[in-house]
Amino acid sequence: GGMNAGKTVYQDENEFGEAAGVEKTLKAAADNYADNETITALAATVADQWAAYQANPTGYFDSVELMELDTMIGGKGINDPALVETLCSNSADAIDWLEENGITLHNVSSFGGASVKRIHRPVDGDGKVVSVGAYMVPLLEEDCQKAGVQMMMNTTATEILTDDNGAAVGIKATGASGETVTVNAKAV
C-alpha cells in the first residue's frame, strides 16, 4: 500500500503513460454514472483538463478533480462528495507535511482504482518499496513522544463523553488489562 495523493511534485518525476486509464475513467463516468450530478460535473472538468494536457503535454497529468472522479467511481457514486473533495484537495499537502516531518514517500506508482500513478510509497536504503504503515508509524510515534503526546496502546474507546450541550469532552476506554480509562479533552 501507500498514500494516494493527486498532483504532487513526485508524480512529475514520472513519464506520463496512463492515457488509457484517464480515457477509461471518463468512459466509465459517461456510461455508468450519467445520472450522478457530482460524477458528471467532475467528468466534464477532467475532460477539459485532459484536452488541455493533450494539447500541451508537459509534466505528469493528474488533478484534484481526477482523483475525486476516481474516488467517486470507486465508491459507486454513493460517497459523500464533500468528504471526497476534502480528502482529494488536501492529499498533496499531506504528502508535503509528511516530507517536512521526515517521512519520505517519493516512489509513485499505480494502485487500486486510480486511473494514473498516484500512490506514494516509501523505499528502503536499497530502493525497495516497503510497507507504508511499518515505515510511517514508528516515525510518527517518535514525533508524538518528542511532543509529549501520551499514547495508549491496546486501549479501546468505548464511549464518547459529552457535556450538557452535547459537545464531546472526552472518552471512556478499556485498557489492555481490562481497566476503565477516562480521558478528558478540549477536543475529541
Regions found by a protein language model. Give the residues of each.
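Conserved N-terminal glycine-rich FAD pyrophosphate-binding loop of Rossmann-like flavoproteins
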Residues: G1-G17
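Generic low-polarity alpha-helical segments
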Residues: M3, Y10, L140, C144, ...
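A composition-driven signal for long, intrinsically disordered, charge-rich low-complexity tracts
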Residues: T8, A20-G21, A114
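Acidic, His- and aromatic-enriched active-site or binding-groove loops in soluble protein domains
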Residues: T8, T174, N184
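Charged, glycine/proline-rich intrinsically disordered loops and linkers
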Residues: E15-L69
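Conserved redox-cofactor binding core of oxidoreductases
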Residues: V46, G59-E179
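Short hydrophobic core segments
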Residues: A157-T158, T182-V188
